[in-house]
Amino acid sequence: MKNRIILCLGCLLAFLQLRAQVNTNQQHLCNPNSFSIVLLGDPQNYVKYDYNQPVFELMTAWTAHHIDSLRVKAVLCTGDLVDQNECILPPFPRFGNLTSREQWTFVSRAFGRLDNKVPYLISTGNHDYGYTRSENSMTRFPEYFPIERLSLIHISEPT
């Protein structure tokens, strides 16, 4: 009797373990003529702190994962990719704990997950210029997002 209880309990646990591995979060579009455009707004607050960066990475990973199921045609970003464009030392804690170079490197890498998978359009914001907030027109944007990378190359779709 004791062995049967242990066997039944083992089978129940095995079943629950297998059930836990099923991806039940399957997004899809009901209308076959529909498509999606993903909007990533103001990433600066995810980028300026190292502990917030995984949130933005998750956003680009989710987007890359759902390109086919949601028929994503483009990704739009509303700018302010970084909090400070040209800050050599990490600013005061309120403004982030990373240098500008670290912020640019991260946001470029995060968007790299979408390279050659879906076109993305990035609008720069005031934080992406000058030393801190657009006091001049100097930006590091072309250094991290060269025109070759951003060109809207047609990605062929099966007919």
What are these regions (language model features)?
Residues 20-98:
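N-terminal active-site segment of His-dependent metallophosphoesterases
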Residues 1-22:
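Bacterial Sec-dependent N-terminal signal peptides
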Residues 5, 35, 73, 118-119:
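A generic hydrophobic-helix recognition signal that picks specific residues
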Residues 87-156:
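Extended active-site neighborhood of metal-dependent phosphoesterases/phosphodiesterases
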Residues 12-14, 52, 90, 153:
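Alpha-helical transmembrane segments and their juxtamembrane interfaces
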Residues 14, 31, 68, 114-116:
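Short, structurally constrained coil/turn elements
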